[in-house]
Amino acid sequence: MLCPEHTRTERLASKVLGYCGSCLSEKKDLISEALLTHRKLRSTNGLVGLVARDGKVVCDGCGNHCRLSEGEIGFCGLRHASGSSIIENFPGQAIVSWYYDPIPTNCTSDWICAVTRKRELHTPRERQNNLAVFYGSCNSDCLYCQNVSHKELTVAGRPLMTPEELANVVDAKTACVCYFGGDPGCNAEHSLSTSAHIHEKWKIPICYETNGNFSRKYLERIAEVVLQSHGTLKFDLKAFNSNLYLALTGVSNKTVLSNFRHLAKIGRAREHEFLVASILLVPGYIGISETKRICRFIAECDVTIPTVLLGFYPHNYMLDLPRTSRNHAHECRKVAEAEGLVNVRIGNIGLLSQEEYNVE
């Protein structure tokens, strides 16, 4: 559909939000309606509707910092408040599944990856697989989520694995590990413990593919794991404008941006690539203007941070949007480079379409 406020300029909008990215960025009165949409859809799926803000018990498990009342469950579904404490629903375990992904994978940082390029690590030829670790919970609620099956796992509360059990999956053919989901952001302690067990036996790269919404208490430990193992921290910057981010994901990006700044500072002394920014080009929402804001933010942190522009594929509640067009991707690349970024690429080129729409 076309945004009702921009029919003359034909700006795309998804029915689930009813307005385009420009309207959501500029009109705060639309955000309450967007959050109501998130709450209704999540409640229908058996999930906690919104990030709790009225309770007295603060959860520091991730960057949402839910403020929970007695017995209330956090947004991620993994923790609840009891008395004055936060209690893990699955002590010592996480809702997680895994599979082996033959290399080369569809990794968003493949062009700077030590395993793929074999410049920094001498990976034995027999190591041919990436261990893809899929966490079945998330601290975000992207309306276009590409891995929405994590919600079913959250509700089911299974499969469950301890860090030791997950680490034991690694074998001699494993070249690297990537935590994604869902998101490792609300499973930080489990991922760190798993990584420690892995490195007792295997010296392989550990990577994170994340929305970046970590609790600060875990951030430097995760950075250390990634840096020391020669992995990458793939950070999905969904939007810079706070209202737009809230409308698309149901959560704030305040901690996300703060975490990215902090990681960029850590990465300035890097000997190999460490932090990678990814931007999903969602038609009608993440166009030239918003991409410019995101890239300006990245450039202010460090112009050398590798940045990948990703094509959008219609999914979840945004099935009515087209795939990202080639024109959209190429115009956004021009914007990224104009903002000073020196290592920009367009990813998943095979998804790009010939659709014509307003890419502003």
What are these model-predicted stretches?
Residues 21-22, 57-78, 134-148:
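Local cysteine-cluster metal-coordination motifs and their immediate loop/turn environment
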Residues 78-228:
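Conserved Radical SAM active-site core
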Residues 74, 131, 275:
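A broad, low-specificity signal marking well-ordered, structured residues that form hydrophobic/aromatic
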Residues 16, 33-36, 72-75, 79, ...:
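A generic "cationic amphipathic patch" detector
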Residues 28-41, 58-60, 67-102:
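Hydrophobic scaffolds flanking metal-cofactor catalytic centers in soluble metalloenzymes
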Residues 58-61, 132, 178, 234:
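Structured core elements
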